[in-house]
């Protein structure tokens, strides 16, 4: 007896039920994966770190602005001030290397950030109670060492919080808030000195400093919980950081920092050029006004530079900033005797530092392996500190022995070297 179920021809069209199944299968195979929703980059954690940077900068800019006046009242010379600041910078650089090694552990980096902000605030404010120069040196050195410890931890925390595709904007926001603090700190110092005097003003700087520590605690509470891992001994990893694209990036950063002179030399150059035909006080005020313009330019450009870095690549923004620095050094070398003649050099250097500081952090975060971020930021921060110290020292010698123009020409050469070294740096995919 024949089978009652009809059998379709072998090469005939499939039945409707089979068509549906095949179509569904084809669609399932060809459909692209559903894209993940982008995380908002300006999250509570990013805002918390930005607030910490702003408040901390306000807090330590007050004693920094008033330190020359305090030391003068203690009978200290300008050479002693320079020595204290040089030692403090060296301690900060060493502490940044150590802080980077400790910050590879997510648990340690959180404790370092809170402790670093708190210690900097307390030690800086205690300078207002000193009775001798050596006490200033100890407290300033301790405050800067604590500041050095916290920097790699803060930068690594920000990389934990921000989505990778928005590193540029996140670090740009942090730099903008830091620069706002650099503007607000001296203005607050001027106001407080008129109300309570130099020593009390320095003592009151503890308030914004401790508020910065609270802001970091807030940011940590909004940081994704780190995966548990075995407690590792503290060690600074160097070899992997100096290899490949990360190594090339560090060489480029080192070259830049060897030409990244302290902004006080910009102010000195402007003061000397503006002084002929003017009272010294007027020249100083005009030079400080140009310095404020420098900080405003850096603040305004930081977030847009980060946004461009997210779209076009942080190394492109870094290269642009380095090139602008080279152009500003040419302006400082040529000089001028009016504010209008000097303003372009200050504005160019302000835009340049806004681009460079934003893109340096974002580049390190994007190029460094996740497990080495703390060490990478530590090496980076150490290079910054020691490079700045070397740049200012050599430029100062050339300034005194030959001429200011020679010093700025020397610095411009380092910008060219940094641009060449930056070639070939690639972000991690």
Residue ranges and their predicted role:
Residues 111-125, 206, 316-331:
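Structural signature of the two symmetry-related core transmembrane helices
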Residues 160, 217-230, 424-429:
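Helix-loop junctions on the cytosolic side of multi-pass membrane transporters
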């Amino acid at each position: 007896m024949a089978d009652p179920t009809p059998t379709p021809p072998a090469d005939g069209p499939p039945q409707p039920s089979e068509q549906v199944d095949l179509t569904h299968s084809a669609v399932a195979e060809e459909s692209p994966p559903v894209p993940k929703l982008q995380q908002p980059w300006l999250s509570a954690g990013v805002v918390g770190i930005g607030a910490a940077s702003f408040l901390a900068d306000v807090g330590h800019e007050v004693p920094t602005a008033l330190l020359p006046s305090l030391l003068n009242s203690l009978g200290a010379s300008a050479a002693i001030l320079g020595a204290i600041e040089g030692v403090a910078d060296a301690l900060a650089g060493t502490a940044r290397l150590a802080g980077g090694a400790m910050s590879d552990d997510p648990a340690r980096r959180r404790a370092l950030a809170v402790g670093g902000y708190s210690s900097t605030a307390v030690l800086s404010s205690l300078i207002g109670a000193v009775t001798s120069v050596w006490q200033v040196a100890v407290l300033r050195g301790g405050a800067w060492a604590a500041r050095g410890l916290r920097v790699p931890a803060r930068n690594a925390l920000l990389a934990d919080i921000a989505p990778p595709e928005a590193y540029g904007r996140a670090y740009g926001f942090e730099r903008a808030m830091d620069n706002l603090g650099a503007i607000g700190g001296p203005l607050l110092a001027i106001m407080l000195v008129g109300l309570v005097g130099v020593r009390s003003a320095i003592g009151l700087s503890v308030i914004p400093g401790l508020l910065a520590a609270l802001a970091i605690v807030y940011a940590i509470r909004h940081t994704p919980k780190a995966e548990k891992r075995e407690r590792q001994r503290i060690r600074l990893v160097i070899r992997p950081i100096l290899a490949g694209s990360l190594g090339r990036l560090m060489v480029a950063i080192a070259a830049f920092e060897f030409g990244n002179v302290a902004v006080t030399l910009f102010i000195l150059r402007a003061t000397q050029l503006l002084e002929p035909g003017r009272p010294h006080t007027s020249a100083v005020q005009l030079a400080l006004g140009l310095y404020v313009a420098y900080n405003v330019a850096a603040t305004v450009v930081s977030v847009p530079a980060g946004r461009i870095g997210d779209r076009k690549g942080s190394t492109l923004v870094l290269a642009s900033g380095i090139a602008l620095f080279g152009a500003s050094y040419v302006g400082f070398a040529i000089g001028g005797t009016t504010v209008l003649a000097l303003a372009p050099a200050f504005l160019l250097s302000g835009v340049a530092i806004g681009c460079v500081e934003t893109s340096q952090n974002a580049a390190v975060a994007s190029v460094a392996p996740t497990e080495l971020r703390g060490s990478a930021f530590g090496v980076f921060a150490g290079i910054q500190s020691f490079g700045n110290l070397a740049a200012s020292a050599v430029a100062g010698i050339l300034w005194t022995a030959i001429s200011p123009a020679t010093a700025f020409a020397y610095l411009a050469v380092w910008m060219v070297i940094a641009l060449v070294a930056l070639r070939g740096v690639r972000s991690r995919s």
